[in-house]
């Protein structure tokens, strides 16, 4: 069982933190490399558990994957894939069941090879995350999809066919899967009510580089199928969720952090909320500087919604800040129905939180106290680390392996700015 030990010294975090490439961008782009018959070189790739899991899945199909490392065995953040000789069409069950993004391989596999076998995807336990919209859209495009227990067997006679598809609700994963499936389909596919997150725009940019014909107009995406896709070199966008998490670390500890490698436009929907709770967000020499304006953290009312609104992936971390804010804050979770598991753990630190359906009310208190905590998913682990930075004494976070699915070397980055965090197996 992996553990994180945080010793609070009430020290404001001060320093510089380099923001890595986006977890939510690299995974669909790695899946999209299946569409290419040539090698693909990706830069700014974060060294995360999920990236290694996706690499295993690609290699299991016959792809060559090289995640280059320096002499000290640390990743230099360049990954090369070669999917020119795929010889297996069954995605590894055990690995796929650990990784939500494994389902994004279905569209590319069907589009290029006409067949695929996979498992229902894994990932964080944050409530129902159905794949019915993915399946429905692929069936509309001509795929035959059968469910056999936990397995999904998909085939198509000939090529997938372009269709007009309207998503019943905005879905990042469904939008990505349909776009990838449509790139090698016959005819034109139009997606209405598509998600427009920066990570999707990065996927589209990558697909265009390898030869896809894609146009986007607000929430409408139009893909004209082509016969073949090639290789390219592409740099992954920076991780806005990682940036937002470290920004909150500065605010919670009343410190000052310089976030390098991220543009303000990348995190505007997050920065707006940070400014509302009393953060000062400044630009300096191409970086973003985060600190408190003055005094204490302000309470807020916020709802998570699809981009460009406040992201669900930042909700747990914001809740940690609200635990020590002035007044009562209300957070409404509109994306996932089971994303308040961190509230029980924050209460162990002394936080005053009440939950009613999809709303959490947080009555801010002056201080938190260290405790023995149990993490349940990626973002909740990050939230517990943030709260532990200002909890008196020592805090132990069990099941902390979740953190490495989305944050590269978080403890090292925070320690370089004054935190006292250690890791045990």
UniProtKB/Swiss-Prot annotation:
Its main location: cytoplasm. GO terms for biological process: cell division; cell wall organization; peptidoglycan biosynthetic process; regulation of cell shape; UDP-N-acetylgalactosamine biosynthetic process. This is UDP-N-acetylglucosamine 1-carboxyvinyltransferase. The lineage of its organism: Bacteria, Pseudomonadati, Pseudomonadota, Alphaproteobacteria, Rickettsiales. GO terms for molecular function: UDP-N-acetylglucosamine 1-carboxyvinyltransferase activity. Gene3D superfamilies: Enolpyruvate transferase domain (3.65.10.10). Pathway: Cell wall biogenesis; peptidoglycan biosynthesis. Keywords: Cell cycle, Cell division, Cell shape, Cell wall biogenesis/degradation, Cytoplasm, Peptidoglycan synthesis, Pyruvate, Transferase. UDP-N-acetyl-alpha-D-glucosamine binds at residues 100, 313, 335. It comes from Wolbachia sp. subsp. Brugia malayi (strain TRS). Cell wall formation. Adds enolpyruvyl to UDP-N-acetylglucosamine. Pfam families: EPSP_synthase. Phosphoenolpyruvate binds at residues 23-24. It is found in: Cytoplasm. CDD domains: UdpNAET.
């Amino acid at each position: 069982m992996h553990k994180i030990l945080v010793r609070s010294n009430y020290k404001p975090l001060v320093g510089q933190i380099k923001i890595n490439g986006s977890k939510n961008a690299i995974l669909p782009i790695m899946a999209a490399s299946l569409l290419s018959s040539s090698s693909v070189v990706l830069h700014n790739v974060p060294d995360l558990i999920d990236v290694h899991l996706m690499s295993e899945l690609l290699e299991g199909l016959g792809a060559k994957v090289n995640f280059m490392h320096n002499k000290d065995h640390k990743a230099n953040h360049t990954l090369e894939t070669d999917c020119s000789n795929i010889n297996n069409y069954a995605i590894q069950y055990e690995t796929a069941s650990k990784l939500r993004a494994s389902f994004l391989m279905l569209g590319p596999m069907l589009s290029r090879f006409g067949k695929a076998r996979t498992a229902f995807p894994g990932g964080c336990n944050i409530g129902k995350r159905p794949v019915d919209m993915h399946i429905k859209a692929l069936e509309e495009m001509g795929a035959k999809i059968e469910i056999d227990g936990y397995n999904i067997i998909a085939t198509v006679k000939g090529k997938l066919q372009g269709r007009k598809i309207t998503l019943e609700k905005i879905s990042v994963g469904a939008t990505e899967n349909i776009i990838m499936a449509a790139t090698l389909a016959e005819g034109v596919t139009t997606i209405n009510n598509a998600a427009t997150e920066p990570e999707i725009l990065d996927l589209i940019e990558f697909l265009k580089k390898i030869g896809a014909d894609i146009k986007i107009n607000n929430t409408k995406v139009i893909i004209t199928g082509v016969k073949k896709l090639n290789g390219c070199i592409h740099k992954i966008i920076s991780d806005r969720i990682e940036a937002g998490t470290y920004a909150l670390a500065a605010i919670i500890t009343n410190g000052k952090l310089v976030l390098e490698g991220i543009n303000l436009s990348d995190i505007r929907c997050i920065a707006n909320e940070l400014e509302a709770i009393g953060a000062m967000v400044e630009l300096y020499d191409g970086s973003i500087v985060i600190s408190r304006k003055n005094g204490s953290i302000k309470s807020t009312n916020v709802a998570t919604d699809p981009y460009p609104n406040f992201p669900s992936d930042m909700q747990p971390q914001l809740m940690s800040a609200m635990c020590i804010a002035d007044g009562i804050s209300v957070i409404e979770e509109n994306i996932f129905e089971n994303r308040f598991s961190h509230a029980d753990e924050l209460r162990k630190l002394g936080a005053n939180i009440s939950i009613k359906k999809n709303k959490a009310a947080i009555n801010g208190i002056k201080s938190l106290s260290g405790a023995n905590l149990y993490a349940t998913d990626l973002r909740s682990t990050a939230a517990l680390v943030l709260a532990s930075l200002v909890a008196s004494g020592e805090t132990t976070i069990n099941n902390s392996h979740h953190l490495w699915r989305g944050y590269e070397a978080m403890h090292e980055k925070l320690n370089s700015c004054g935190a006292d965090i250690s890791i045990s197996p």
